[in-house]
Amino acid sequence: MDEIIEWLLRLIDFDTTSEGPDAERCVRYIARILAERGVLVHAYTTEGALRRGHHLLAEVPGERAETVLLHAHLDTADRGGEQDWLFPAGRASRRRGCVCGRGALDCKGPLAVWMKLLSDAAEGKPRPYTLKLLVTDLEEQGGAEGLGALLAAHPELLSDVKLVIGEGGGFPFPFREDMYYTFQTGEREPAADRPARTAADAADRDRILAMGVEKGYYSEDILAYAVRWDRLAGRRLDVRPLYEDMEDFFTAAPVSAVYADHGPAFASALREEIPNARLMPCVTPGTSDNRWFRNAGVPVVGFFPLDAANSLGGIHGSNEYISESSLRLAYRVISGALDRIT
């Protein structure tokens, strides 16, 4: 844990905002740390409208070329009005068991954990598969000039990749005696100029929910939970537009086997740390760099489990932080999942 926190503090101190000057220095820092631990590193650049993008691929060969790829972006949202921050936005600090500063949660905290997992792999016995880390830039600008351009120029980066683990999931919420953790299996991109729709009735909603199971985006037990939630929520708010969005997504979405193929490894590792934890496979709104992998036909999950007390309010806002307990939990769970993936 000491290394993860040390690295994260240093990563936050690099100004990698949209027009920040430190992306290249940040990549060099990551490369040096990993190379010192025996990890193979390769640097790449792409051209962006605001600045050049800087990217890094790190690799620990395994017994097979088949690859699990960890992904994080090094660029951060801009800091906004620093008068709204309770601590320095652009300088890392530790307060009350938390690491604070822009990028702590999105996405330098996960990056520091991924660096530790690569270091562990380089110093331990070979895994059955190759483990790689891809650090990308310009995600906050939409990714087209970052990961999108990088993969267009270097499609070989995805050769032999059987799974990508990225951001967009791992957010906890309680339900009865269990703690559910979101497990991103897809993303619903914003639609421009949507045509008017006839609101879905109850029978339509059941059919639309079933589409998600049939295509593999979530499971039967999650479907049962959603139906119960719908019956309760429907008494207080109009949930019909939600189902219209879901129908749009599932009609066009490809069949996904990512939850069936890889969910059990993550669920088992999570329950080892939190016995009452369960995965909640979900399709999230918005767009992250995960979509570039999905568009290339590569399975990807969004999952970085956080401590239940860790607020998400600082993402793209003020007072961004990540708790040290979240860093510890994510490290243990993802390490355990990697041990279970064969």
Residue ranges of predicted features:
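Hydrophobic/aromatic beta-strand patches that form the interior of the parallel beta-sheet core
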Residues: 12, 42, 68-70, 134, ...
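Glycine-rich phosphate-binding loop signature in dinucleotide/nucleotide-binding domains
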Residues: 63, 156-163, 273, 296
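Short, conserved micro-motifs enriched in small and acidic residues
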Residues: 97-111, 140, 321-328
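Active-site nucleophile and cofactor-binding loops and adjacent substrate-binding regions
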Residues: 46-48, 103-107, 283-286
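Acidic/histidine-rich catalytic neighborhood of metal-dependent amide-processing enzymes
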Residues: 105-186
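Acidic/His- and Gly-rich active-site-bordering loop/insert found
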Residues: 1-102, 121-129
